Structure formats: structure tokens, C-alpha cells
Swiss-Prot record:
Chain spans, region Interaction with guide RNA: 530-567, 758-805
Record-given protein name: Protein argonaute-3
Top-rank lineage group of the source organism: Eukaryota
InterPro entries: AGO3, ArgoL1, ArgoL2, Argonaute_Mid_dom, Argonaute_N, PAZ_dom, PAZ_dom_sf, Piwi
Species assigned in the record: Danio rerio
Enzyme class name: hydrolase
Keywords, ordered alphabetically: Cytoplasm, Endonuclease, Hydrolase, Metal-binding, Nuclease, Ribonucleoprotein, RNA-binding, RNA-mediated gene silencing, Translation regulation
GO molecular function: endoribonuclease activity, cleaving miRNA-paired mRNA; metal ion binding; miRNA binding; RNA endonuclease activity; single-stranded RNA binding
Catalytic activity: Endonucleolytic cleavage to 5'-phosphomonoester
Coiled coil: none
């Protein structure tokens, strides 16, 4: 986080972020290593210059080449032996002043262009200000805090940004930068993902202010890139064509649409002009093949004639197309009609894939990138040694020193809470390493199921009647043991086919069987039926549904059935377990509501779809039952637009459920990046207050607002081998860190609340941005850890508190409610939901939950 990027818009001083209330002391100490490396920075001032490059809007890569060439070219007159560092946009830093007038200096820079033509750039350099690293030392040691007005200055004058640019300058020239990571093309290894994509490995690097020092956070990182290959091969991969020569016919419409979707927006280079490898961006794929696709060609005598692409290539380049029956790529601007046959194009190397990966690609990616904690630790250490920062001439220029051993940190393993079950003997479960067992225990409050139905959307061949019968018998046995008795056989059990049959069947059930509590739906693998079941059940008719994959019906296991019962009991109003009351923190002594909030955005490149905001609120004192609210809002908008009305609904609902008004509101907010802290806090805190005042003028409960972050690159490792847990050698569940690698004076901490099963555990990062309730560090860390044990869908502690997790589920479910049957396939992992042309009212209505479902945990 930039030093002090919090506070509020206009840096209103009343919105300064709470200072750390002290350090946590609870739990058993554990020695850890963090992938943070100390950077020693001199107490000096550096010089910031503004760089203006014309023509504007060049990619950063080009800007860097321009600046690099400029430094070489004007070495004698301006730069001498200085080694400036540059951020790829507007900011250039030097350790010594440059001999340029205060009005700035204009320079001409030439880069070799394509086809022997030079490209000329005009560069203006102008001094802006000194950036002080003295101040940085004062802040890091906690001797001074930035003045709130400092926070509104441009990022370039921020001393942390300057440190970041110095350490990023050389890698940005050497590798392909993506966000805060660097990648290089795979040499000597090959990790295809299918569909023309492959895995590139690289590293993440970012600078963070920590206690007493600056830290460089380094992590191994992987992402999907498009494979550099002929477009014909790319097409074959995307369309699963094994041999292009066996495809003598033009592409079918559905194939062409699929191919267009994948290649649109990618850069290709041509191969038919010798060494002139001109690059183009694809804007479309033609409907007609190269043998029929025409364009107006101007002859030398000024006459214009229609030519097909195939004819033109034969006449102009003496090139007989091998695949004239395949379509052409339309490149450049759509109105210009530039067509290229597929066979003369290659995919340009180094293009990152921002489109969503398919399920298969995602699982291949996870397999290729998951590393056990000790392996990852070793890999990061190797990376830092080979990066050899201290020999980087730019790091030397600014007199930095980067330590090459990981930061040693003392963490604490918090005690796990005990969980109260029900039944006659009211047993208590004590988690061990984040896991506990329900065998021999009964739900705290089990529901009795008297009337239920089964709808099987798998075929009779996939799931025979006796298999169904076996499944229901097993389910009834397990549910009885768990204290959720399912009485008798289902009142209805029928086979059906396809999403179109869901609504008529459910309507029939609702009208025929009064008091029907549950429909169990059996699905044949990945299918649009799921989205339709949830749309009809959650939004249209208000019926509880539980989907089961056919493979889990054919081959049942007690574990799967038990997990089904966890979900069913909660959907029907039961309570699986509660935190043992006497060990909960003191915040529970008065009525308190826990809110979780999340905004999910449409996949990249999908500009038309809305973002979805979800807020859930606890409805009892345990807290175990939650109620959901959900809204659609403008795409990519991070602030929850309608938060005041959502919180108001939840407060009213809490009052109806408990007959109390909460005196405290604990708000866990997921999915905010550090650059947005101030903006989101300012808007949302006021919205929560507004919700309270709208209910009663004098109603002012204490609000605690916490951001939960999972998407960061801090990893923690056990320093002592003996403390490693499980097959992947991770840190134990409950590991907490609030010193050394955390903020110099703001209230943040890392907590790894789950047991890592695969790969390296990622601790969640909690940032308390507002706290009227004056929590101590211990109280708040323990509360957060306990809430990670209240997630109803499994008997494990999860990686973020239950309310934040539920908000995520609610938003994700709303994506399914938005699937528009006419236009969307809801296929693959792409729940698409552009409600093509549906207006905002229609979208808002589509995610509205039926009043019978509203008060249930339908999302469980």
C-alpha cells in the first residue's frame, strides 16, 4: 500500500484510518519466513522529471525503448554517466540533477520502424520536484505520519513509487511485464493449456513499506499466454481439428463464431512479405472463404475492380492459396476492409490471455503451477539469488542494497474455537489443524423433511431407477444419523430432459404438493439445466433445490452424502453447529450484526455485462444464519452503489429475527485493492451510517469496517521443518502475523485460517479501515479466526470469514440468475449472462430473489 493511501476523498481528516491498537499476544509463537526481502535505502533526495512523448498513446514497451534510446543518444549533452529510471509512462527519476532549463527541453528520438522506415518521436523532459527518501525513513520508523493533504498528491511524488520504479526498471527492459509481474517466453519447457494457450512462468515483484524498513515482496508467478504459432494451427487447436487437410469444406457457422471469439483482438504478423513481418490486430473473421471474399482493388490506370482475396494473392504475390475454402482475418479498422488469408498469418509472441480460461485449462494451469510450500520457498530463494539485485546498475545508481534472505517473522498460532453440535448428547467438536469430523454428532438444530421430490435430468441409461433408489436410501440413512430425518420416499420422482422442462415441472410440483420442502435435482455433468434450476427455484417460484452430479449418485460416498446434508439442513432453516458461547470474544455481549460484502465483475473483455454486488448479514446471535441482498450495477464499478438500501434491509431483517437492534456492525469487505481503499471506505462507511439513520434518527451503532484481501503475493513458510503441516508442508491453520512485514502504523494483519491441501497456503490480509468499536488486536484477530469456522458447507475452517465467503457465493449465484436462455449457453465456466440488450430494470428483476427464498440461505 502506498504510504498512507487511505483517509478519505479530499483527505477529510475525520476519515483517517485507525492506528494499530497494539500487537496481538494470544496463541503459540511460531518462527516463520516471509517472501519479503529488506531493501536498504539511502537518506537522500531524488529528482523527478516529467516525460512527455509524442505521438502519445504508445504502449509502455515502446515508451521504454524511446527513453532508453534518448539516454544513449544525448549522453554527452545531457545524461553523462547518470542512469535514470523510468516508469513507462510520465515519470523519470535521477540520482543527480540533469542540466535542463526549468522550462524543460525538447528532444527528437528516432527508432527503427518496420520495413526500413524510421519512427520519429518528440520527447519533452521537465523537472517536477524533489522526492524525499528522508521522509520515508521517518514514516517507516513511525516517527512521523504523512499529513492527510500529502495523500492527494500525484503518485509520482510518492517516495514509495520512486523506490518501486528503481527496482522495476531493469526487469521491465528484460522481460514481458504484466501488472506487477514479469514473464519470459518458455525456453526448454512446454506447458500447453489447449485452445492455443500456454503457461508462462515468471515472478511478481512489489515494494511495500513495513515496520522500520522497506520490503521487496517476491513471488513465483504464472499466467496464460497465447502460443506463437501459425493461425491455421491456432484455429485447429481452438476447434479441435486434428488434421486440417481432412477439412476440405468451409467452416460451419458455429465453428466460425467460436474461432472469431478466440482470435478477435489478437495481434498477428504476416509471413508472405519476406523479412517484412508487418503486425496487425484482428477485428473480425470473414463469413466467406478466401476464394469468395472480395474487395475493391484500384488498378494502376485508376480503374477499380472487384477481386477475391485468393485471386489477389495469386496475382500480386504469385501465391496459390492452399486453403482457399477457409475464411480470412479482417485486420486493422473494420471500415478499411483489409483481409488476410489465415495461412499467411502467425500469432505474435508475448500476448497475455485475458479471456477467462475454460474449466479444463484452469485445472491444467493449477496442476502446472501448484508447488508445495517448501518447493515454493526454495524456488523464490533461487529466483532472488539469480536476480542478483545488488549488481543491477540502476539499483547501484540509487545506492540501494537488497538483502537476499527472506524476512524472519514471529507469528502466533491462534487457538481454534470449539463447535457445539446438538442431538441428545450435545457433543462438542474441537478442530485439529483446521478440520473436524461430524461422525457421531448431530446437527445443532436439524430439520425434519416430510415432503420432498426428485427430478433426474440425467438419462435413464446414465442413472437407472434402482441406482436412484439406492441413492435415496443411503441419503436417508446418513441424514437420520446427522439429526435431519427425511421421512418416507419422495412424493415425486421423474426423469426429464433439457433446461426447457425445468419451469413446467417445478410449477407442477408447486401446484400439486402443498408443503413441498425440497427438490433434489440430478444433473448430467456440466449443463445449462443448473442455471435454470436456480433461476426458477430462487427467483421465480421460491423453492429449495439441491443439485447433485449424476456421478455422485451412481457412486455415492458417506463423505459426499454428509456434505449434501450440511447444505440441505441450512437451506431449509436448520443450524449445523454454533461456536461454543462461553469462548466467544466480548463483542458478543451486546447484539451485533456481521455483514459480508463483495462485488464480482464480468470476465475481462466482456464490457456489456453488469457487475454484481452482494451483501449478507447475520440473523442470530451465534452467528450461524445469514440473509442475502444482491444488486446489479455498472460494469467494473468497485463501490457498492446501493449499499445504504441493502444494509437497511438487513438491519430490518435482523430486528425481525432477533427483536434486537444491533449496537455494533462488523463489516467484512472483500475484493477491494489498495489503490481503492480511500474511495470505497469513504462512500461505503457513509452509506452504512445513512442506512442506520434512515431507520431512526438517533440510531448510531459502532461500525468496524475491514477489507479482506486474498489476491496478494505474501507467503509465509515454517522456519522449523518440524512445524510444517500436511503433505504440502504448509503453516498451521490459525497462523497470524501482525509485526515486521505489516504496515508501519496502520491496523493490518495476516491470518492463515485454513489448512492448505494443495500448493502453498495464501494467508488472508486484513486491513481495518474504520473502527468505532475499539477492538484490541487480540480480540479482532480471534473474532476473525472464529468466524472462519462458521462456514456451513464443510467441516473445515475456511480461508476468509463466513460472511465474506457467503457474499461471494451470493454474487456468483446471481450470475446464474442472469443467464438469458435465448442468448446464453451458460456453457463451460463462462456463466455468461449478458442479458443481450436487456435493460437495467430487467437485469435488476432477474437477480431479485423470490420472497419465500429471501429469508433462507438458498446460496449454501
Amino acid at each position: 500500500m502506498e504510504i498512507g493511501t487511505t483517509g478519505a476523498v479530499g483527505a477529510a481528516p475525520q476519515f483517517s484510518v485507525p492506528r494499530r491498537p497494539g500487537y496481538g499476544t494470544m496463541g503459540k509463537p511460531i518462527k516463520l519466513l516471509a517472501n519479503c526481502f529488506q531493501v536498504d535505502i539511502p537518506k537522500m533526495d531524488v529528482y523527478l522529471y516529467d516525460v512527455d512523448i509524442k505521438p502519445e498513446k504508445c504502449p509502455r514497451r515502446v515508451n521504454r525503448e524511446v527513453v532508453d534510446s534518448m539516454v544513449q543518444h544525448f549522453k554527452v549533452t545531457i545524461f553523462g554517466d547518470r542512469r535514470p529510471v523510468y516508469d513507462g509512462k510520465k515519470s523519470l527519476y535521477t540520482a543527480q540533477p540533469l542540466p535542463v532549463a526549468s522550462a524543460g527541453v525538447d528532444l527528437d528520438v528516432t527508432l527503427p520502424g518496420e520495413g526500413g522506415k524510421d519512427r520519429i518521436f518528440k520527447v519533452t523532459i521537465k523537472f517536477v520536484s524533489l522526492v524525499s527518501w528522508h521522509m520515508l525513513h521517518e514514516v517507516l520508523t513511525g516517527r512521523s505520519t504523512p499529513d492527510p493533504l500529502e495523500l492527494d498528491k500525484p503518485i509520482s511524488t510518492n517516495p514509495v513509487h520512486a523506490v518501486d520504479v528503481v527496482l522495476r526498471h531493469l526487469p521491465s527492459m528484460r522481460y514481458t511485464p504484466v501488472g506487477r509481474s514479469f514473464f519470459s517466453s518458455p525456453e526448454g519447457y512446454d506447458h500447453p493449456l489447449g485452445g492455443g494457450r500456454e503457461v508462462w512462468f515468471g515472478f511478481h515483484q512489489s515494494v511495500r513499506p513495513a515496520m522500520w524498513k522497506m520490503m521487496l515482496n517476491i513471488d513465483v508467478s504464472a499466467t496464460a499466454f497465447y502460443k506463437a504459432q501459425p493461425v491455421i494451427q491456432f484455429m485447429c487447436e481452438v476447434l479441435d481439428i486434428h488434421n486440417i487437410d481432412e477439412q476440405p469444406r468451409p467452416l460451419t457457422d458455429s465453428h466460425r463464431v467460436k474461432f472469431t471469439k478466440e482470435i478477435k483482438g489478437l495481434k498477428v504478423e504476416v509471413t508472405h512479405c519476406g523479412t517484412m513481418r508487418r503486425k496487425y490486430r484482428v477485428c473480425n473473421v470473414t463469413r466467406r472463404p478466401a476464394s469468395h471474399q472480395t474487395f475493391p482493388l484500384q488498378l494502376e490506370n485508376g480503374q477499380t475492380v472487384e477481386r477475391t482475396v485468393a485471386q489477389y494473392f495469386r496475382e500480386k504475390y504469385n501465391l496459390q492459396l492452399k486453403y482457399p475454402h477457409l475464411p480470412c482475418l479482417q485486420v486493422g479498422q473494420e471500415q478499411k476492409h483489409t483481409y488476410l488469408p489465415l495461412e499467411v498469418c502467425n500469432i505474435v509472441a508475448g500476448q497475455r490471455c485475458i479471456k477467462k480460461l475454460t474449466d479444463n485449462q484452469t485445472s491444467t494451469m493449477i496442476k502446472a503451477t501448484a508447488r508445495s510450500a517448501p518447493d515454493r520457498q526454495e524456488e523464490i530463494s533461487r529466483l532472488v539469488r539469480s536476480a542478483n539485485y545488488n549488481s543491477d546498475p540502476f539499483v547501484q545508481e540509487f545506492q540501494f542494497r537488497v538483502r537476499d534472505e527472506m524476512a524472519e517473522v514471529t507469528g502466533r498460532v491462534l487457538p481454534a474455537p470449539m463447535l457445539q453440535y446438538g442431538g441428545r448428547n450435545r457433543t462438542v467438536a474441537t478442530p485439529s489443524h483446521g478440520v473436524w469430523d461430524m461422525r457421531g454428532k448431530q446437527f445443532h438444530t436439524g430439520v425434519e423433511i416430510k415432503m420432498w421430490a426428485i427430478a433426474c435430468f440425467a438419462t435413464q441409461r446414465q442413472c437407472r431407477e434402482e441406482v436412484l433408489k439406492g441413492f435415496t436410501d443411503q441419503l436417508r440413512k446418513i441424514s437420520k444419523d446427522a439429526g435431519m430425518p427425511i421421512q418416507g420416499q419422495p412424493c415425486f420422482c421423474k426423469y426429464a430432459q433439457g433446461a426447457d422442462n425445468v419451469e413446467p415441472m417445478f410449477r407442477h410440483l408447486k401446484n400439486t404438493y402443498a408443503g413441498l420442502q425440497l427438490i433434489i435435482v440430478i444433473l448430467p455433468g456440466k449443463t445449462p439445466v443448473y442455471a435454470e434450476v436456480k433461476r426458477v427455484g430462487d427467483t421465480l417460484l421460491g423453492m429449495a433445490t439441491q443439485c447433485v452430479q449424476v456421478k455422485n449418485v451412481v457412486k455415492t460416498s458417506p463423505q459426499t452424502l454428509s456434505n449434501l446434508c450440511l447444505k440441505i439442513n441450512v437451506k431449509l432453516g436448520g443450524i449445523n453447529n454454533i461456536l461454543v458461547p462461553h469462548q466467544r470474544p466480548s463483542v458478543f455481549q451486546q447484539p451485533v450484526i456481521f455483514l459480508g460484502a463483495d462485488v464480482t465483475h464480468p470476465p475481462a473483455g466482456d464490457g456489456k455485462k453488469p457487475s454484481i454486488a452482494a451483501v449478507v448479514g447475520s440473523m442470530d446471535a451465534h452467528p450461524s444464519r445469514y440473509c442475502a441482498t444482491v444488486r446489479v450495477q455498472r460494469p467494473r464499478q468497485e463501490v457498492i452503489q446501493d449499499l445504504a438500501s441493502m444494509v437497511r434491509e438487513l438491519l430490518i431483517q435482523f430486528y425481525k429475527s432477533t427483536h434486537y437492534k444491533p449496537t455494533r456492525i462488523i463489516f467484512y469487505r472483500d475484493g477491494v485493492s489498495e489503490g481503492q481503499f480511500r474511495q470505497v471506505l469513504y462512500y461505503e462507511l457513509l452509506a452504512i451510517r445513512e442506512a442506520c439513520i434512515s431507520l431512526e434518527k438517533e440510531y448510531q451503532p459502532g461500525i468496524t469496517y475491514i477489507v479482506v484481501q486474498k489476491r496478494h503475493h505474501t507467503r509465509l513458510f515454517c522456519a522449523d521443518r518440524a512445524e510444517r503441516v500436511g503433505r504440502s508442508g504448509n503453516i498451521p491453520a490459525g497462523t497470524t502475523v501482525d509485526t515486521d512485514i505489516t504496515h508501519p502504523y496502520e491496523f493490518d494483519f495476516y491470518l492463515c485460517s485454513h489448512a492448505g491441501i494443495q500448493g502453498t497456503s495464501r494467508p488472508s490480509h486484513y486491513y481495518v479501515l474504520w473502527d468505532d468499536n475499539c477492538f484490541t488486536a487480540d480480540e479482532f484477530q480471534l473474532l476473525t479466526y472464529q468466524l472462519c469456522h462458521t462456514y456451513v458447507r464443510c467441516t473445515r475452517s475456511v480461508s476468509i470469514p463466513a460472511p465474506a465467503y457467503y457474499a461471494h457465493l451470493v454474487a456468483f449465484r446471481a450470475r446464474y440468475h442472469l443467464v438469458d436462455k435465448e442468448h446464453d449457453s451458460a456453457e463451460g465456466s463462462h456463466v455468461s449472462g449478458q442479458s443481450n440488450g436487456r435493460d437495467p430494470q430487467a437485469l435488476a428483476k432477474a437477480v431479485q430473489i423470490h420472497h419465500d427464498t429471501l429469508r433462507t440461505m438458498y446460496f449454501a
